[in-house]
Design a protein with these regions (language model features):
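Conserved DEDDh/DEDDy metal-dependent 3′-5′ exonuclease domain
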Residues: 51-52, 57-190
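N-terminal accessory regions of nucleic-acid-interacting proteins
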Residues: 1-52, 124, 132-133, 180-186, ...
Length: 214
């Protein structure tokens, strides 16, 4: 579980594609208990559309330890610690402006796992959440990750070894936060080449049967 209470803003670069002209990415890291409306607004204002890339990292017993949201030019990385559960104002901000903001689509991998962790760990719901890959055995495979990124930017050559490194299972640590942030950025880039998907995860639905809407 993350115990840092600091926040930081840095600049990182993607290395998935052999293309030096892709602009640098601003990475803001903040503990949930220190989340501000400005941090959220800076992310949302950097969007050119309605789709966000999302990445999550889990600790022991699948407890959520880090959550990242990405546009093309900015990543907001939120870490959890022992005070996260009681950070009511900040949790409400996260819920209202990002997680349950129906004007924003949230795209990532294994989104049903994130939905469960948000509810069990923080008592939060998520709406307009979509899984980038939903076809059975391909989920979570390196071939699937590479395929999504390759289709997203056909004009650029994909560095497959970087994809394998970034998406390898590894514990989240602050000293490697840029690598985790790039997962969210990759989800943002990947979804830009995918048409609208019919299946949406909505854990705020009162009817349990309607929580996965087809």
């Amino acid at each position: 579980m993350m115990m840092s209470t600091t926040s930081s803003v840095t600049t990182i670069r993607q290395n998935f594609y052999h293309n030096g002209s892709i602009p640098p990415i601003t990475l803001e890291q903040v503990d949930l208990a220190s989340l501000t409306a400005k941090s959220v607004a800076d992310l949302v204002n950097s969007l050119s559309g309605t789709r966000l890339g999302v990445a999550a990292s889990y600790g022991e017993k699948c407890v959520l330890v880090a959550l990242a949201f990405s546009s093309e030019s900015r990543v907001l990385l939120i870490t959890m610690n022992g005070t996260s559960g009681s950070a009511k104002r900040e949790k409400n901000l996260l819920r209202d402006e990002l997680l349950c903001n129906i004007s924003l689509e949230k795209h990532g991998y294994f989104m049903e796992r994130l939905a469960a962790a948000l509810y069990l760990d923080l008592g939060l719901y998520i709406r307009q959440a979509f899984d980038l890959i939903s076809d059975g055995d391909r989920r979570g495979s390196m071939a699937a990750y590479k395929g999504v990124l390759a289709r997203a930017r056909t004009q650029d050559s994909l560095n497959e070894s970087v994809v394998e490194y970034i998406f390898a299972e590894q514990a989240f640590i602050l000293s490697r936060q840029s690598e985790f942030a790039l997962r969210a950025w990759a989800c943002y880039v990947g979804v830009q080449g995918i048409p609208e998907k019919p299946d949406v995860i909505d854990t705020s639905a009162k009817n349990p049967q309607a929580r996965l809407i087809h």
